[in-house]
């Protein structure tokens, strides 16, 4: 059967495999493409091909990630798989590969291991909306042990505020599915059905409230002030009221013009690089780092909690640890803002390569909500990355 050209008829969902090292994440990824390829819904990807994941850079951090795509009857999926544990942490914290849901792979022979717990915690911290579990290697695990592992997993998921009692747990063998064993192939299809039905369809960026970070500001004589940037979410139309949020006190304005590539438009939407003209705003009142947003949808803050990853020396990060009250720059969307870091109780210092929760206080307020990603920089050099997990004030 000839592969059909990819048509945008099915909803698109981003997922990934997470879990402890050697529990079978990459084997499962290969098995999914193998089983779906037989139905003409994926291109076959070999284990070795997925395992040699290319390196990518996101917010100045190098991450190895393999991207695989496939479809089911209901959806089109982009699936990510990371070779190393550190790659997962970096991926989840930088949001390099945004996950609408994840497949947690746990070996029935081992049960939950340290990285299983760590990945569940991270998924909670960075708000991965839903998890589905694949209990792997059940062909070589003791059936009584499998029952215990399942109970233990449900407790662990509940501990991190996932609905442990309701999460689908599919049992199978990724390796046997790769070898074409019919029963194991059926388990892969069962897993895909669970992913289809249990992982919610994401809200598209266009359907979210309007937000555009300002990258540049200039004035057009006789017409007013223009802010340019890439529209992050939503839709904006001429005549609509917006709020200008961050750095200075929040103020309202009305959009009097929208331009893209020198052409005037009546509306702009998520993904567009646009110039927006504002009524009654002076050039001095707008600056890079502010955001233009639908009124009442986002507020400016200076204090927040965050989950951060600090780069290793080999990754171009710091060579030395840092201590309480460390003051780097935090790069949010389009600008750097200095802030002070408060370490959790009992933590004396942070070493390059560490991943932990911290509290940050910025010197000026920035428009933020939970899940906002940022880079940690020192003089323009990236030394870490983070995700806002809770706003304090």
UniProtKB/Swiss-Prot annotation:
Region spans: G5: 173-175
Positions of region (G4): 136-139
Region annotated G2, chain positions: 60-64
Record keywords, A-Z: Cytoplasm, Elongation factor, GTP-binding, Hydrolase, Magnesium, Metal-binding, Nucleotide-binding, Protein biosynthesis
Region entry G3, spans: 81-84
Superkingdom of the organism of origin: Bacteria
Catalysed conversion reaction: GTP + H2O = GDP + phosphate + H(+)
EC category name: hydrolase
Enzyme nomenclature, EC number: 3.6.5.3
Binding site for Mg(2+): 26
GO MF, one example: translation elongation factor activity
SUPFAM superfamilies noted in UniProt: EF-Tu/eEF-1alpha/eIF2-gamma C-terminal domain, P-loop containing nucleoside triphosphate hydrolases, Translation proteins
GO cellular component: cytosol
Occurrences of domain tr-type G (ranges): 10-203
Compartments, as annotated in UniProt: Cytoplasm
Keyword set includes Nucleotide-binding: yes
Family the UniProt entry places it in: Belongs to the TRAFAC class translation factor GTPase superfamily. Classic translation factor GTPase family. EF-Tu/EF-1A subfamily.
Complexes and interactors: Monomer.
Primary role: GTP hydrolase that promotes the GTP-dependent binding of aminoacyl-tRNA to the A-site of ribosomes during protein biosynthesis.
Name the UniProt record assigns to this protein: Elongation factor Tu
Lineage start: Bacteria, Pseudomonadati, Chlorobiota, Chlorobiia, Chlorobiales
Primary gene name: tuf
